Amino acid sequence: MLHGSIYPKSLARLAAYTAALAVSCAALPGASAQQPDSLNLQQELLRLGEAATELEHTLPSFTCQESALSQQLKNGKVLQGVQFVATLRAQRGADGKLDESITITSVNGQPFTNGHFHLPVFVSGGFDRMMRYFAPEGQACYRYSLAPGRINFQALPGPDTPTCKDSGTVGFALLDAAGNATRVERRVDQAMAKPRKEAIYAADDIAPIELNGHSYRLAHHLYAEMPAGKEVGAFTADYAACKLFTATVTISPATPAHDTPAAPPE
């Protein structure tokens, strides 16, 4: 879901998250007494893996309205903030990757047509990447555990490799009664996030959206934080009115050819 991960906002939340992580590490599958839990975990990973594959490979091009707030924070105080509204387009390119672009329509409540302005931070990639922690080809890179209403994940220790690229990442997904993800959060150790240009914390709230007759689970709310020296860039975005994106092609009338006199009959 974009580059990012979990950054607790209070000591109480940090304590709760640490407790959940302790449960995650203690509940590894393997012992015979945990076989039913292990089976349920594998079923859940299969479900989430299918959702991740859909987003990465079959999610069609689409467009949404993005309403966002970009802030520069220091010691919890806002140093700078910019609000904007934009038309977001996520288009699948010839290489199969989903590329996001935006056309900004208003800045701080005023219409915007052209020119330049400074955003403290901008975050993208929260649609096709938010479920990548459950992609089938990468599940061997993580340690998972299942708890009521959630699944925890933690990247296995060790340096990044071409297959496992998320060292220092830990997070969880909240699940509905059917086992579908409704929220994904994760954090990345700051020392590892910086060279990878990842958010140290990111959270996506997810809801089903129908595109081209198929239901996809897409982010409708995103919050992320990026380190910037002694300051932090905070990015909040809401996505609405998402629909299938189709390019418009205008065909101009053909240039009429000069009339050629018909040859006389022989």
Short names for language-model regions:
Residues 15-27:
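Bacterial N-terminal signal peptides
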Residues 2, 27, 211-215:
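Extended interaction regions within the primary functional domain
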Residues 173:
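Aspartyl protease active-site motif detector
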Residues 33-169, 177-183, 187-202, 207-216, ...:
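Structured extracytoplasmic
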Residues 1-13:
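N-terminal secretory signal peptides that target proteins for export/translocation
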